[in-house]
Amino acid sequence: MKRIYFLIILLSIVCGVSAQETLLLPFDAVELTPEQKISSPIYLAYPLGMKNDMPIMKCDNIEAVDLGLSVKWATCNIGAEYPEDIGYYFAWGEIQRKVSYVWETYKWCRGSENTLTKYCTDSSCGTVDNKTILEQRDDAAAMNWGNEWRMPTSDEFKELKDSCDWVWTTQNGRNGYTITSRINGNSIFFPATGYTWMGNEVVKVNQLASYWSSSLYAANPIYAHRLYFGENNIGIDDDYSYRYKGYNIRPVCP
């Protein structure tokens, strides 16, 4: 009955939107098949109006893969059940999902890029504390999956890039990179998850992806380091983005 109710609402919305307009769908509002989830171009982080203060539990099938590197890498993103699933988007240093990703809703500022309240190395950007790595309480991996997990640093992303072969491929309908260790041959898959745009829109799914590191871009603290990739580009060296943006997170553990 609940599913029918949501479908009726959804159909009434769709009927009032022209084919040229962008329709933002609350991702969990209806029960979608895996194929529908893959083909749907737009995702919101969680249903509009839903209170979101519960941890995002790690699915039982998620494992830590030993690639012969300094850390082990999870098989899935936070919020994902399978490696090809998108999972959820987070602003840097925030541990909960939300609907809108803009400076005005960012936890660690007072509404703008020059009013940072934490993780700041420049007085022109806010209150200086010289913190450059996320504390555990602000690490979405640790706070949602447990203390044995955390977000990777920018150096760990660089190690992943430099020590593995990256092959653009498609897994169960999702484009992304199969990343295979040159040390022991083990592999993981990073899906092309897109990224948030203009606050609550997600774009470039199956084309591009951004994954947060736990490392601040100390030269300008309104940014943090990320892994960014597309089919013909893999960026981590000096790749950074605005902290308020919603990107995915791939946890690591010892």
Where are these regions (language model features)?
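Conserved positions within compact, well-structured domain cores
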Residues: Y46-P254
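Sec-dependent N-terminal signal peptides
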Residues: I4-I13
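Detector for intrinsically disordered, low-structure N-terminal pre-sequences
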Residues: S12-G16, A29, E201
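Positively charged n-region of N-terminal signal peptides that target proteins for export
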Residues: M1-I4, Q20
